[in-house]
Amino acid sequence: MSKLSRRQQEILDYIKEEVRAKGYPPSVREIGEAVGLASSSTVHGHLSRLEKKGYIRRDPTKPRAIEVLDLENLASETTEAKATYIPVVGKVTAGLPITAVENVEEYFPLPEQLTANDNTYALRIQGDSMIEAGIFDGDLVIVRQQQTADNGDIIVAMTEEDEATVKRFFREKDYIRLQPENSTMEPIILTTCTILGKVIGVFRTIH
């Protein structure tokens, strides 16, 4: 393997430490904070060079997944269940793929059996519009990317104002109704919307 720069070695060592401690690799943001890099694009650049030099592998079918290739010594130190790392989307930008680098804050491990395909991502909920469906502010919803939905499905949709929202979907005769699960809120009525995926699960950290 090619020799690493000091910064690349710091990043690789940090990834290994996190895998030892947690059983899964750190987010790009966490890597930047650990080694003193404020720019996520700079971190991505170092990760690309580590990959080219053969130290890590990033699976393009599983966005943001990082696999350290010299983990023989770590294998006996972690009891990690086999997991798929899905991107956590902090925002949705019109015109960009939902899992574009610009949208992704970190990644999150899920058991492989919960991800039927590679088109799964997580979205952090902001607000209380879905509380009566058991989805609360700060929760992560697990979303399967798809462009269609049945009436009653909870979906991630892009509205006509290019804003992403999580609501229950209903196609009425002359319009689309995005229904909040909060009796104090009114539905969103649209002539059209772009469906970005169906919510298939919720993850919440109990403090």
UniProtKB/Swiss-Prot annotation:
EC number: 3.4.21.88
Site (Cleavage): 94-95
DNA-binding region: 28-48
Catalytic activity from the UniProt record: Hydrolysis of Ala-|-Gly bond in repressor LexA
Top-level division of the source organism's lineage: Bacteria
CDD domains the UniProt entry points to: HTH_ARSR, S24_LexA-like
Gene Ontology terms for molecular function: DNA binding; serine-type endopeptidase activity
Active site: 129, 167
SUPFAM superfamilies assigned to the protein according to its UniProt record, in alphabetical order: LexA/Signal peptidase (SSF51306), Winged helix' DNA-binding domain (SSF46785)
Alphabetical UniProt keywords: Autocatalytic cleavage, DNA damage, DNA repair, DNA replication, DNA-binding, Hydrolase, Repressor, SOS response, Transcription, Transcription regulation
BP terms from Gene Ontology: DNA repair; DNA replication; negative regulation of DNA-templated transcription; proteolysis; SOS response
InterPro entries for the chain: ArsR-like_HTH, LexA, LexA-like, LexA/Signal_pep-like_sf, LexA_DNA-bd_dom, LexA_repressor, Peptidase_S24_LexA, Peptidase_S24_S26A/B/C
Coiled coil: none
Family from the record: Belongs to the peptidase S24 family.
Record function comment: Represses a number of genes involved in the response to DNA damage (SOS response), including recA and lexA. In the presence of single-stranded DNA, RecA interacts with LexA causing an autocatalytic cleavage which disrupts the DNA-binding part of LexA, leading to derepression of the SOS regulon and eventually DNA repair.
NCBIfam families with a match to the protein in the record: lexA
Quaternary structure annotation from Swiss-Prot or TrEMBL: Homodimer.
Protein name stated in the entry: LexA repressor
Organism listed in the record: Halalkalibacterium halodurans (strain ATCC BAA-125 / DSM 18197 / FERM 7344 / JCM 9153 / C-125)
High-level lineage: Bacteria, Bacillati, Bacillota, Bacilli, Bacillales
Gene name tied to this protein: lexA
